[in-house]
Amino acid sequence: MALVRWRLRRGNFHLLSRVLLLKLTVVIISVLLFCEYFIYHLVIFQCHWPEVKTLAHGDRQKPVLKAMFLADTHLLGEIRGHWLDKLRREWQMERAFQTALWWLQPEVIFILGDIFDEGKWSTTEAWADDVQRFRKIFRHGSHVQLKVVIGNHDIGFHYQMSKYRIKRFEKVFSSERLFSWKGVNFVMVNSVAMEGDGCSICSEAEAELREISRKLNCSREVQGSSQCEGEQRLPFSAPVLLQHYPLYRASDANCSGEDAAPPEERNVPFEEKYDVLSREASQKLLWWLQPRLVLSGHTHSACEVLHPGGVPEVSVPSFSWRNRNNPSFIMGSLTSKDYALSKCYLPFEDRVLATYGAAAVFLVVLILAHLERLPSSFLFGWKLRKMHMRG
């Protein structure tokens, strides 16, 4: 009789073990799917394109261009990039980017520099590997255009940059500086070359910008017809200036918001030509291009600044968890005359980690709850075995 009872309890033990294993598997898979996939849909689904005025132009309304702006992706390289850090950060950016494409369907995407973390010193082989990973993470359909601006981590600071690194970057991402679509002009500046010291790279970059300025002036019909004769006219629209370094500002003291720099860092003075462009370079860009809007990266934090002449600048926070807990990107609805911007936050890293922590606690409680139901089966079997051994 005792042996029958022991066999029943042993069968019950195996059943409880299988039930526990099934529950653990379901919980673990559910948490992984939520934290690594569904959470991106849940968060980005709540983002919406801002509305912009579409004033009638004759019998037609002005077309609206939907543009996404993100910055400082900092794909890790072979020197400073631990494999686990790479895996975690790049998966986060890939899921965020692909989910944003799915829900928001932008027409053009701009990345405002520091695409890579080690472009300034990477070897040819390491560069090729970084580019391959970039193309996988930021893959997109042919109906979407992706434009990239040079950052200091892509080619090095002014004293590190070389024509070789610039050509290597432009071979992959194009050397285009002026881009027009749906009546909206974008000027993409290599802000690393705005040192103003007369170096050959800097002189070429400034000459390019002066030529773009001339073309923009022709579209405004500022210059005489002789200077613009035979020129293919750009859309009559003040440009949007895109660059990595922000225009000159003393610090982030006037920046606010949950994704601005931490309070203890906001009053730290910025260094010209390192944290921001110099006063002189900033004045040149504003004078030459007369932009209606400036978007920049580099600081990894958000800020909105109003420059002389009423020109607004938006500093776009980093897109990567590696640089901040609450990454985001900017959504812009633009016409040739007007624009509207809104911000779309990505999942916060600490909340994802908290979800994993809560799941781990739940698993421990679940295991302990099942173990409390098992000792009687073990004890009964142990006693029965001892009785047989004595017999």
Swiss-Prot record:
Spans traversing the lipid bilayer: 25-45, 352-372
Residues reported to bind a divalent metal cation 2: 72, 114, 244, 300
Q: Which UniProt keywords apply?
A: ER-Golgi transport, GPI-anchor biosynthesis, Hydrolase, Manganese, Membrane, Metal-binding, Transmembrane, Transmembrane helix, Transport
Tree of life domain: Eukaryota
The Swiss-Prot or TrEMBL record annotates one GO molecular function as: GPI anchor binding
Q: How does it sit in the membrane?
A: Multi-pass membrane protein
Please name the CDD domains in this protein's record.
MPP_MPPE1
Record note on quaternary structure = Interacts with GPI-anchor proteins (via the GPI portion). Interacts with TMED10.
Which family does this protein fall into? Answer: Belongs to the metallophosphoesterase superfamily. MPPE1 family.
Q: What does this protein do?
A: Metallophosphoesterase that catalyzes the removal of a side-chain ethanolamine-phosphate (EtNP) from the second mannose of the GPI-anchor protein intermediate. Participates in the glycan remodeling steps of GPI-anchor maturation to allow an efficient transport of GPI-anchor proteins from the endoplasmic reticulum to the Golgi.
Kindly state what the record says about how the cofactor is bound: Binds 2 manganese ions per subunit.
Q: Where in the cell is it found?
A: Endoplasmic reticulum-Golgi intermediate compartment membrane
Q: What is this protein called?
A: Metallophosphoesterase 1
Please name the GO terms of the biological process aspect recorded for this protein, alphabetically.
endoplasmic reticulum to Golgi vesicle-mediated transport; GPI anchor biosynthetic process
Q: Which EC number(s) are documented for this chain? A: 3.1.-.-
Per its Swiss-Prot or TrEMBL entry, what cofactor is needed?
Answer: Mn(2+)
Which cysteines bridge via disulfide bonds?
none
Lyase recorded as keyword = no
- Listed SUPFAM superfamilies: Metallo-dependent phosphatases (SSF56300)
Q: Which residues bind a divalent metal cation 1?
A: 114, 152, 244, 298
